[in-house]
């Protein structure tokens, strides 16, 4: 074989391998996806790379192989891709967001696989708390893996699954805008666009789902979807125990004493996010003890924040300085409430034994959504807790039936 022929053959093999990495993509599209760096360098794109495309486009991607003790690739997926894609922060600045794209096994139906874009529950606010960075025994492992059975169930039913990390998780900057619904929601929609850059033959029909923080973020995503992804068909939103009424809850929690120290870490994640959003200097609002601990929110995950060496030994009524006013913070907390207008059907599932997202607040949210004209189905489950509403087989079956009805 001549040198010229060998060179041509090598080019063909290289192009074929690239195309095989991205099933359903043309050769030109496959070549346009930049090869991702290995290790944690995956999460570090330059400002130039981030600004080189529109929100919802891919910076780079790489395949993650399934292993029995792994956390990122799913057992029921034919392929899991780790993706870094473009989005915007709450102020409209271009940012990179990480996430995962899972394809089901088997041949795609006519029109392509329909899909679910998932918004996860609270793991923390540090970059290491991202689901895509999870490992067995990791700092947020138990806050992530409870939903794995749901992902596999959806894949087995024939749906592709997209799992954003959210801004500021995985990628270090910007700080994670915890419960800032527009930011979370945008990242949930943008990954649906990014997935279709990888796999253009995916169906345009998709659902948005989420739990807790993600239940709230998913509702915001549902309201944003028609504008952010007008060429796709968002067929509905299913939301497990969505966080809501943070302003009302903040007023109640701020007066709680030592018996409620276990709430302080979560309260501080919310307050820290609100201070960032409102551009309030912590020294004007919180006690010196609390201010000294704030950097920990960007260093460790929720499970560690609840420890006695951080927030676990501080009562909620010891967070704020005496006599401070919080008007700008209150405005942010009110804006976190997901009483949004969604044109597609909505399912809200709530465990009645939930002591994290209280059923009374969820019932109030459902009433607000219905008043706005949203088509809401509200299913409650006696005896189920905050995580139980996601993991319980009976509740899961109800939600899966709803999913199948929307994605027929």
Q: Where are the predicted features?
A:
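Short beta-strand/loop motif that positions the catalytic acidic residue
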Residues: 342, 347-354
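Primarily recognizes the serine-hydrolase "nucleophile elbow" in alpha/beta-hydrolase
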Residues: 193-199, 203-262
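Alpha/beta-hydrolase active-site loop
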Residues: 178-198
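Short, surface-exposed "cap/lid" segments of acyl-processing enzymes
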Residues: 90-98, 102-157
